[in-house]
Amino acid sequence: MRKASLVYQNNYVNYLLMKILFKYATAALLLAGAAACSQPSKRASIIDENIAVAEKQIGMLADSSETGGVIRIPSTWKNGRIDYVPVDDWVSGFFAGTLWYMYELTGDEAWAARARKHTEILDSVQYLQWHHDVGFMIYDSYGNGLRLKNVPGYEDVIVQTAKSLATRFRPVPGVIQSWDADRGWQGERGWQCPVIIDNMMNLELMFKATEFSGDSTYYNIAVKHADRTMKEHFRDDYSCYHVVDYDLTTGGVRGRCTAQGYADDSAWARGQAWAVYGYTTCYRYTGDKRYLDHARKVAGFMLDDKNMPADLVPYWDYDAPNIPNEPRDVSTAAIIASAFYEMYTYTGDELYKQKADRIVESLSSPAYRAPVGGNGGFLLMHSVGSIPHGSNIDVPLNYADYYFLEALIRKARVEAGESLF
């Protein structure tokens, strides 16, 4: 325990020092970048225009989700109806997070009040142990609420959720097991310890739990998971496998495959985006440059791939067989844009800001942003859940809206020369 605590303390001191340096170095970089912008009015207007549309769309969706005194969780809209999910669904925290982002973008306390209601129906999730996505579910809801309003009790929920997620850590392979091997749509696959690249997105919860509690356990689990994933999930070109299955006895790899991509050896688009975002986040909390370098290499794969469209809204899989006659995935584009704005603040590489801006422009166009009053109230159209499972194909998805609003917030801060965190 003493050794682990010292390891954490040293890393955490480094993190705090890095954070201070970033605050000033990044501010200088961002101010220089903001001064160099040649079309500030256009950039400001695209943010304001999206906020105006989002107020109408997300307001309509929130109204629909609060009828009859019952708070429901909207996930998508298809066949003329809103689909709602239970609190234990992996996407259950995104709409609450979207409402928090609406508060952040507008300053209107009515959004904060709504966000609290939609957040607190997720209270039981802090004890959920049968899948890994509690990081998404709780940090995007309670985490944003704590950050923006410092709501009493929210910090405790985050720490308890990390305790629950830590029960899924498998010490022999050194990973957080994503799915139970015998439960859900993957239960027939014969896996022992499946880990999906999406799991990188749950690590922020663990880093924050250590920050809040002082317990190094969560930090160390997150680092071990990130390191093993870096070693096992990526090919030589920095594309990634969706699923790696580990042997719980030996810790070795039993197999590499896909669940939501086109083929075991293909590059499922959203998986690449999760990797870029996840490793950039790991860099933010650890200061370990390996993570940022890795995120940049995965980003390079995406941007250089021959099948990346000019508008930077990827096809659902970079190796899908019928490109260009394949569905695009707007959710992937939104995740990439948000991650790229953060990467820009650490690297000063204008490429990331330029590409993020291009994505925001694309998603703000009529090709991808819904007309006011349509799309069931969702902001963006044309996302893909899982084509192999026939699930949520070419529909709006709540996490596409979430990451798009996050990208707008980050864009605004970058262009104002402000720190993102």
Model regions: which residues?
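Glycan-recognition and catalytic cores of secretory/periplasmic carbohydrate-active enzymes
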Residues: 41-421
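Bacterial Sec-dependent N-terminal signal peptides
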Residues: 1-45
